[in-house]
């Protein structure tokens, strides 16, 4: 017998009162019980839920995360090895050399890189990501990365990740040989919306880098930014794109409009809409590490951070981001302690 709780009137129901299964009831069976992620059409239904069902969604997303990922939260810190001067035109990014942004090109020295890794490890983090604002690494950058990784390994017990743009097959092998644990390269948005965000390279070029990274044995980190003008349909498409890729980690960023960039005048995503996206992406990716990344402070604030961690998130970036300020590491760690969520241990990350 179908109960009233399991069905709701369809938005497309005709005068005959046709009903369809409630999407959250479907998700409980499909995702929570069987561990099968929602498809694109189903994710769209979740994104279209009314605001009065947000808490119900977040509770379900948290239950899914606890069942299929467990209670541990992975903590990561990031550092910019090479800041600014990027030749690409990613419309959200203040590090592009094509825009009138206040960010200027600069390199970080190896001792500063090691010190940042030490401070990251002291926070309880197990992952330290070295980032460079480039289309892809040249010989000089790869040499700096190699020296930095070696210096960090000699002094700090932490996994090292990298985010260096698009790679050649040879560069992928070089990074794997350096011992890079995880490689980040975000698809940023749905395939159908990508040309509204970037025009100097293609979505397919990014995808190719990610598949080569996986084939080389490194973990794949791939997410994007929500709130760049995409429709709910495209947001659902993006979740499906990520599910097809099946990365080890998905960082969810929320647009923090930067002065001087083409997206500098966009509105910040409403908190409820951002949290609904968090829950929807968890239901699409039940077994994937889902990380709170940039923009959550301006979009969600302190209360939103708690609701997100109780709504499907199981990883965080602590401290500052590349060109914007983040929450203090102590604030996130205190929140996790209050919620009695253990930090992922280093040996569990290897």
UniProtKB/Swiss-Prot annotation:
Reported cofactor(s): [4Fe-4S] cluster; [2Fe-2S] cluster
GO biological-process terms attached to the record: biotin biosynthetic process
Residue positions binding [2Fe-2S] cluster: 129, 162, 221, 291
Pathway: Cofactor biosynthesis; biotin biosynthesis; biotin from 7,8-diaminononanoate: step 2/2
EC code(s) of this entry: 2.8.1.6
Example GO molecular function: 4 iron, 4 sulfur cluster binding
InterPro entries membership: Aldolase_TIM (IPR013785), BATS_dom (IPR010722), Biotin_synth/BioAB (IPR002684), Biotin_synthase (IPR024177), Elp3/MiaA/NifB-like_rSAM (IPR006638), rSAM (IPR007197)
Region spans: Disordered: 1-20
Catalytic activity: (4R,5S)-dethiobiotin + (sulfur carrier)-SH + 2 reduced [2Fe-2S]-[ferredoxin] + 2 S-adenosyl-L-methionine = (sulfur carrier)-H + biotin + 2 5'-deoxyadenosine + 2 L-methionine + 2 oxidized [2Fe-2S]-[ferredoxin]
Record field: compositional bias (Polar residues): 1-13
Domain Radical SAM core: start-end pairs: 71-296
Keyword Transferase: yes
Residue positions binding [4Fe-4S] cluster: 86, 90, 93
Protein family per UniProt: Belongs to the radical SAM superfamily. Biotin synthase family.
Subunit-structure text: Homodimer.
Described function: Catalyzes the conversion of dethiobiotin (DTB) to biotin by the insertion of a sulfur atom into dethiobiotin via a radical-based mechanism.
PANTHER family given in the database record: BIOTIN SYNTHASE, BIOTIN SYNTHASE, MITOCHONDRIAL
Name under which the protein is recorded: Biotin synthase
Species the sequence originates in: Mycobacterium ulcerans (strain Agy99)
């Amino acid at each position: 017998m179908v109960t009233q709780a399991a069905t709701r009137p369809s938005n497309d129901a005709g005068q005959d009162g046709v009903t369809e299964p409630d999407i959250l009831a479907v998700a409980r069976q499909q995702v929570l019980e069987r561990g099968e992620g929602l498809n694109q059409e189903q994710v769209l239904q979740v994104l279209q839920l009314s605001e009065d069902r947000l808490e119900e969604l977040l509770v379900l997303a948290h239950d899914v995360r606890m069942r299929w990922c467990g209670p541990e939260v992975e903590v990561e810190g990031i550092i910019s090895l090479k800041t600014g001067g990027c030749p690409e035109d990613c419309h959200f990014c203040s590090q592009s050399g094509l825009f009138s942004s206040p960010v200027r090109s600069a390199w970080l020295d190896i001792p500063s890189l090691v010190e940042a890794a030490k401070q990251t490890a002291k926070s309880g983090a197990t992952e330290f990501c070295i980032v460079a604002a480039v289309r892809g690494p040249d010989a000089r950058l790869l040499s700096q990365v190699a020296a930095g990784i070696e210096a960090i390994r000699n002094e700090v017990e932490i996994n090292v990740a990298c985010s260096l743009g698009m790679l050649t097959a040879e560069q992928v092998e070089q990074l794997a040989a350096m011992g890079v644990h995880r490689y980040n390269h975000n698809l940023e948005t749905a395939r159908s919306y990508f040309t509204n965000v970037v025009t100097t390279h293609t979505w397919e070029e990014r995808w190719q880098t990610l598949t080569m990274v996986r084939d080389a044995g490194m973990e794949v980190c791939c997410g994007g930014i929500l709130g760049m003008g995409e429709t709910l349909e495209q947001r659902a498409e993006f979740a499906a794109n990520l599910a097809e890729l099946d990365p080890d980690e998905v960082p969810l960023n929320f647009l923090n409009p930067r002065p001087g960039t083409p997206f500098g005048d966009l509105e910040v995503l409403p908190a409820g809409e951002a949290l609904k996206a968090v829950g929807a992406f968890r239901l699409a990716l039940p077994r994937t590490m889902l990380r709170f990344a940039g923009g959550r402070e301006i979009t969600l604030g302190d209360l939103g951070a708690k609701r997100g961690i109780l709504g499907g998130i199981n990883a965080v970036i602590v401290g500052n981001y590349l060109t914007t300020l983040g929450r203090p590491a102590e604030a996130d760690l205190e929140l996790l302690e209050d919620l009695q969520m253990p930090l992922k241990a280093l040996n569990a990350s290897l």
